[in-house]
Amino acid sequence: MKKTISISLFIIIACTLAGTASEDVAKEKQYVSVNVPNADIKIQYKYSLLEDRVIELNRTGLNKIFSFSRIYKNFSWKYTDFPSGRLDGLTTVQTFDTDIIGPIMVSAESNEDGDDPIAEFTGGWHGFNGNQSGSPTARHVSLQVWVDGKMVNDTFKGYTNDLVIETTSNIQGFNTKKKDGSGREIIQQKVKMKFNEGRADVHIKMVPLEKVRIHTYYGLQTALSQLYANSSIRYESGDSQEWKDTSSGPNDSGPKGKYPNVYRMTAKNKHNDEVVVWLDTKYGLGKRLNVSDKYPSAFFVGYKSYFNLINGIPLIISTGQSAEVHG
C-alpha cells in the first residue's frame, strides 16, 4: 500500500481507507489532544489499515518557538477510516531537530546596534552564533487554538473535523541581535495552520515592527532525514519530471528564470512513503518576485528541501505592510 505524507509548506495527509464507523464519528477523521497552557498539541490521523500517525507540535529549539516537533506511529485497532483515539504506545518515526517553520535573514534599515552584524539567519532554530547555539534570536509571543470553531483556552481531547492553530513570535535582526539575548525585535511572524484529516493549510505573515530589509527567506522547510533519508525528489514544473536521488548530493528545480512556477516538491523513500510540499505561486511571496533568475525556484541540500521565496532581490517593508506566503 502506498502511504503519503503531504506538506503544504508542511501538509500531512493520510490515505483514506475503507471501513465502517458510526455516522457521527465517521465525519471526524482526526483525533486531537490540545494543551494550550503547556503549548503541546498532538494530531492523530489514519495512515494505513493497522497504523495511525501522530503529528506533535510544541515549543522547540533554542528559541522555543511553537512548531512541528515529532511524528509518531502507533497501532490502530479499529478497521475503519478514522484513527483509534489512543495516544499511548507511540513510537517516534521522525524528530524535527531543525527549522520547519523557517528562519529569516533580516536587518533593520536604521539604528544598527547589534553585537555581530554579519548577515545570518535569525528565528527558527538559529541562535546568536548563527547556528543552534548562543543566545535566543526570537521569542514566542502567543498560541491560540480552535477546535471545530470553538476556542480552546485550556485542554481538549477528542475527535474533530477542524483544528486551527495560530502562533506568533517576534524575531531579532542580524544587525540588532545581542550576545546576552537582549537584541531588538524587528519583525513579527504570524503562522496560521488549519488541520483537517491530517492535512494542514499553512499561512505565514511577516509583519515588520520597524522598517526592515529581508535578504533571504524560504518559508517552511522539510527535513528529509530519518524516515525520509535517502529519498528521491521531483519538482513539478521544474527542469525535469524525473526523480532526483537525494543521496547523490544537492539538486534543484532549475533556475527561476527558466522555471519560475515550480509549485510542488515530492520526496519518496524506498518504501514509497511520500512527502508532498506545495506552494501557492499566485499569492504573496509565492510569486517569487524577489528571487533572482539565476537561483532555483526550489532545491534540496544537506537533508532538507526548500522553496526560494526571497533570494537575490531584497524586500524592504515598513510598519503597516507585510510579506505573506500560503501553501
Model-inferred region functions:
Residues D162-E166, R199-D201, G320-H326:
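Intrinsic-disorder/low-complexity, polar/charged segments enriched in Ser/Thr/Lys/Arg/Asp/Glu/Gln
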Residues V25-N63, S69-I71, T266-G327:
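Beta-strand-rich recognition/accessory modules
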Residues T222-A223, N230-G302:
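Active-site/ligand-binding surface loops and adjacent short beta/alpha elements
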Residues I187, G198-S240:
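Acidic (Asp/Glu-rich), glycine- and aromatic
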Residues S8-T16:
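Bacterial N-terminal signal peptides
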Residues S107-N196, K211-R213:
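Extended, loop-rich substrate-binding clefts of extracytoplasmic carbohydrate-active enzymes
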Residues M1-T4:
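Positively charged n-region of N-terminal signal peptides that target proteins for export
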Residues E23-S133:
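Beta-strand-rich N-terminal accessory domains
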